[in-house]
Amino acid sequence: MNETPKPNSFRSGPDEDGRFGIYGGRFVAETLMPLILDLQDEWNKAKTDPAFQAELQHLGAHYIGRPSPLYFAERLTAELGGAKIYFKREELNHTGSHKINNCIGQILLAKRMGKTRIIAETGAGQHGVASATVAARFGLPCVVYMGATDVERQAPNVFRMKLLGAEVKPVTAGSGTLKDAMNEALRDWVTNVEDTYYLIGTAAGPHPYPEMVRDFQSVIGAEAKEQMLAAEGRLPDLVVAAVGGGSNAIGIFHPFLDDPSVKIVGVEAGGKGLQGDEHCASITAGSPGVLHGNRTYLLQDGDGQIKEGHSISAGLDYPGIGPEHSWLSDIGRVDYVPIMDHEALEAFQTLTRLEGIIPALEAAHAIAEVIKRAPTMSKDEIILMNLSGRGDKDIFTVGKILGMGL
């Protein structure tokens, strides 16, 4: 691990080149550079524009349903017999996950820039649904690129996107998952720069996307902080979230980064184990490289070729991670740990039976880590976990594995 000097604040990045230490940046085709700089310029203006912020907050309250509740998981806490467990209930948002927070923010930006066509990539389909939703709300055509493998395992979300008026384009290249969908979306963007806005769904991609997505998702952590102080009179001892590209995680982590009493853990997809290639634990088992416009930890071979990862959860099935997470790992502020498919599956069932909440398989990875850690902590300690999405979309996957025909 690089011995990077600790900054005064963990929340001041990225620098003007979009870098978090050695990570991030803008590695894009020349044709995209003017567009990226234009986007950055508009983003900088929007950040400080009271009218933009007011519209964002209004839609957050009346369209998304914010603030999402902070929920004390009483039965899970009792069952594990250790720390008190609280969930930030992002699965109760409109469209069923945290993805909508970012989509509303970015579509307002797209309109501000005068763009008339939206493109997006999606893995689990949650970002695709959220993109199609905001495109419908603002009357813009939307094309969603989705890996053919994911189209198959996320049928309900594909149908939702089509209902919402989006065109879903299955991508058969590579392993037909999120990485391949993102490649296709970038190709589309390069050829349609004039009228098209690329609505990236995770805290990755070229600058300013990682910063922008983080800022739109930070509403999660900001609300949770306030709600936790109201409920317990203090901050949590531990904050946990699942990490694929890392937008739900950075959204809850960021407001807590400068609170030294708060330990932070990101949970990666351990898949079928770290020994082979069937996992998506980019930080635990990857190395730095460049993909989709930014430098970050990636799953790659000795020649720098991107490996095809695996996770039971389509939303974590990405061979990279947002650059800010790479930096936070290197400087030791956040710990990143893997959870295997079977552990996530077990946690999925545990939460459903104990709390009456069916979580997304992505969030089930975080629950599995909470189940491991809570019993090792004292009863007066507090865990805050981001319950990033609901599991309706995953019942077919889980049903198949458990041998229950649907």
Swiss-Prot record:
Transmembrane segment boundaries: none
Superkingdom, natural source: Bacteria
Coiled-coil ranges from the UniProt annotation: none
Magnesium as UniProt keyword: no
GO MF entries: tryptophan synthase activity
PROSITE patterns, per database record: TRP_SYNTHASE_BETA
The keyword Lyase belongs to this UniProt entry's keyword annotation: yes
Classification via SUPFAM superfamilies: Tryptophan synthase beta subunit-like PLP-dependent enzymes
Sequence positions bearing N6-(pyridoxal phosphate)lysine: K99
Keywords assigned by UniProt, alphabetized: Amino-acid biosynthesis, Aromatic amino acid biosynthesis, Lyase, Pyridoxal phosphate, Tryptophan biosynthesis
A GO cellular-component term linked to this record: cytoplasm
EC number: 4.2.1.20
Listed pathway(s): Amino-acid biosynthesis; L-tryptophan biosynthesis; L-tryptophan from chorismate: step 5/5
The protein's required cofactors: pyridoxal 5'-phosphate
InterPro entries noted in UniProt: Trp_synth_b_CS (IPR006653), Trp_synth_beta (IPR006654), Trp_synth_beta/beta-like (IPR023026), TrpB-like_PALP (IPR001926), TrpB-like_PALP_sf (IPR036052)
Reaction catalysis annotation: (1S,2R)-1-C-(indol-3-yl)glycerol 3-phosphate + L-serine = D-glyceraldehyde 3-phosphate + L-tryptophan + H2O
Pfam families: PALP (PF00291)
Assembly and binders: Tetramer of two alpha and two beta chains.
Function: The beta subunit is responsible for the synthesis of L-tryptophan from indole and L-serine.
Family: Belongs to the TrpB family.
PANTHER family according to UniProt: TRYPTOPHAN SYNTHASE, TRYPTOPHAN SYNTHASE-RELATED
Protein's name according to its UniProt entry: Tryptophan synthase beta chain
Source species: Rhizobium etli (strain CIAT 652)
Gene behind the chain: trpB
